[in-house]
A protein has these predicted regions:
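Feature captures the catalytic ectodomains and active-site-proximal regions of enzymes
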Residues: 1-511
Length: 511
């Protein structure tokens, strides 16, 4: 008997907001999604703040969203966990952080704090940097340098001067710390193996290779004057003294808590074998600490070790001997695999993974179609194999193009995805399968910051849609991302495990 596949389609960054001239989702011509909303049951899901284990009012993100969806429960995020440790005082007694600081003190070497300096809360939080500076002061350190990576995506695109001024004021108040180098996240936090970008930030940190500016704030404002916003600020030197260079024996704490954009820079400092660019011997080895576990294969101590999630959706499907497929392009591949599986690198038994390369362009407004059509082509081909019971698919376009702040490109991104959705749904229904369509967080439904008049490049706290497209009749109630996995299990007629505390969104009378 042919399989009737169940598909979960995640349109990354597709939130709900009133129609308006800066809502790319509403401006786009989406005949396929419009028809599905008219015909099939749909509801709204909360995907920010406490609903996904974040502080109240904190926007969700792709990592958090996929963790919650795959776990079928609210997963308390590293942001919440670390912030709570600071509030409780446990942070300042963390053994890994204490050891790193005491080693630096004993060696008479410098401590370098590197990470994203904003309160975006997606990859890092500036309050965690302030806590590290407080801790360094308590530990009696005096040579402490900050290597500031600039955001411009999870916060406004031209706000780094404000964050750097705040950081500078905080170092003066605490009495320790100095901004040594500054780099846009485009360089320092690449995740697509564009090592030439990482090298620019690395060389600034270890060789002082870059423009020397009077101070961090004036350097950033000079970039603004040249039309370069935060994300793309070319690495520069803000404190040219010799000690601010990273040297062998120094301590380093990378305070980003989200792994995907921290891995490459971390590997540049800690990996023994490193073929991507030349590293001076003067900068190795260092005593490197990761705030969270960036990758099991990275050989560096972790300040906040991962908490294990039992009975994720992928594990339950494997336990029931079902065949599952995860498919996405490069930008969201980690999300439908690593994050969806609760931070597990290894696939479940019966879990196949397909990675479609993302296009090699500087920014995705230049190619808003990204690789959506190639993903769709491959999925259509795999659906014909009659192999899979469950498919997890992510379309990256709404999020990645939304982040550029370019409205017409975001509209094109949404129209591209709509065409792909139409093709996939038609195929799934022809196999008498079911397609659930949702998102992990909002983004492209807000493309302008009405307060500043600047393009809005961050995520939103808006709810996201959830549709069930099926030959069977269903009714739904509102919920949260954690309710998706229990819903999928009910559609598969599989009992929900106790570890999953989400609730099925189905309110069918025949339940």
């Amino acid at each position: 008997m042919a399989k009737q596949p169940l598909l979960l389609m995640i349109l990354d960054g597709w939130g709900i907001a009133p129609a308006g001239q800066y809502n790319a989702a509403a401006l786009a011509k989406t005949p396929n999604l419009d028809a599905l909303f008219d015909k099939y049951p749909h509801t709204r899901l909360s995907c920010s703040g406490a609903a996904v284990g974040l502080p109240d009012g904190q926007m969700g993100n792709s990592e958090v969203g996929h963790l919650n969806i795959g776990a079928g429960r609210i997963v308390y995020q590293e942001l919440t966990r670390i912030t709570k440790a600071i509030k409780d005082g446990d942070f300042f007694e963390n053994t890994i952080l204490s050891k790193a600081m005491q080693t630096v003190k004993a060696n008479g070497s410098a401590l370098h704090l590197l990470g994203l300096v904003s309160d975006g809360g997606v990859h890092s939080h500036i309050s965690h940097l302030f806590a590290l500076l407080e801790m360094a002061k308590l530990q009696g350190l005096n040579k402490v340098y900050v290597h500031a990576f600039l955001d411009g995506r999870d916060v406004g695109p031209q706000t780094a001067d404000v964050y750097l001024a705040e950081l500078d004021a905080e170092t003066k108040r605490i009495g320790v710390g100095k901004i040594a180098t500054v780099a846009g996240r485009y360089y320092a936090m690449d995740r697509d193996k564009r090592w030439e970008r990482v090298q620019k930030a690395y060389d600034a940190m270890v060789l002082h290779d870059g423009t020397v500016c009077t101070d961090a704030v004036s350097g950033v404002r000079a970039s603004y004057a040249g039309g370069v916003t935060d994300e793309f600020v070319v690495p520069f030197i803000a404190a040219p003294e010799a000690d601010s260079c990273v040297k062998a024996g120094d301590g380093m704490i990378f305070f980003n808590f989200r792994p995907d954009r921290a891995r490459q820079m971390t590997r540049a400092f800690v990996d023994e074998e490193f073929p991507y660019f030349a590293r001076p011997q003067t900068a190795r080895p260092v005593n490197f600490v990761c705030m969270t576990q960036y990758d099991e294969t990275i050989k560096a101590p972790v300040a906040f070790a991962p908490e294990t999630l039992e009975d994720t959706l992928g594990k339950v499907l494997a336990d029931h001997k079902l065949q599952q497929l995860r498919i996405a392009e490069t930008e969201k591949y980690a999300h439908v695999t690593f994050f969806f599986n609760g931070g597990e690198e290894e696939p479940n038994v019966g879990e196949d993974r397909v990675l479609i390369p993302s296009p090699k362009v500087a920014t995705y407004d230049l190619q808003p179609e990204m690789s959506a059509e190639l993903v769709t082509d491959k999925l259509a081909e795999l659906l014909d194999t009659d192999k899979y019971d469950m498919i997890i698919l992510n379309f990256a376009n709404p999020d990645m193009v939304g982040h550029t702040g370019v409205l017409n490109a975001a509209v094109k991104a949404m129209e591209t995805v709509d065409a792909c959705v139409g093709r996939i749904v038609e195929k799934v229904l022809s196999l008498h399968g079911t397609a659930c369509i949702t998102a992990d967080h909002g983004n492209l439904e807000k493309m302008l910051d009405e307060t500043t008049g600047q393009p809005y490049t961050a995520h939103t706290t808006n709810q996201v849609p959830f549709l069930v497209v099926s030959d069977e009749k269903h009714t739904l109630h509102e919920g949260i991302l954690a309710d998706i996995a229990p819903t999928l299990l009910e559609l598969l007629k599989i009992k929900q495990p106790a570890a999953m505390t989400g609730k099925s969104l189905l309110t069918d009378k025949n339940k």
